[in-house]
């Protein structure tokens, strides 16, 4: 059975590749900002919104490829009730990291599998990350080292690189922090016979 990842995310694609999963990457055209604003206005939770976005992505691609299992995933960063999007530039990334310094935030991460336009399964994880009280000197070195690569992450960090040094404690699933609850997804795919067991 063919697997498709409804995402252009290099982190998600890399996770699947490293797990030995052959999935074609086909990004879904979804107006994420509009969906987030609409759901937030309706009082939806971050988990409901992340799942709706993941579902939209998987559903759109699964209608075009009805015989494939399509994986959609989305992640929202929540800090003290506020939702955050990716920083548009390094100046705002710096401000965000200073704002998160010494505080905890959550990465609400949802994955959905769809086939033929219908949702087959979904799963949500909400890891909690505690950012340490780092110095401005450390932050300046970190920003210089990582550069614009930080703008691809909603939290302005990559745990698989020097970004791990921003934290003193992490609670929850590592793969969910990277962008997709991989172990529950693998379990579903085996159960659905989309993977060899």
Swiss-Prot record:
MF terms in GO: nucleoside triphosphate diphosphatase activity
Keywords, comma-separated and alphabetical: Cytoplasm, Hydrolase, Nucleotide metabolism
Annotated EC: 3.6.1.9
GO cellular component: cytoplasm
Compartment list: Cytoplasm
Membership in a protein family: Belongs to the Maf family.
Protein name: Nucleoside triphosphate pyrophosphatase
Species for this entry: Granulibacter bethesdensis (strain ATCC BAA-1260 / CGDNIH1)
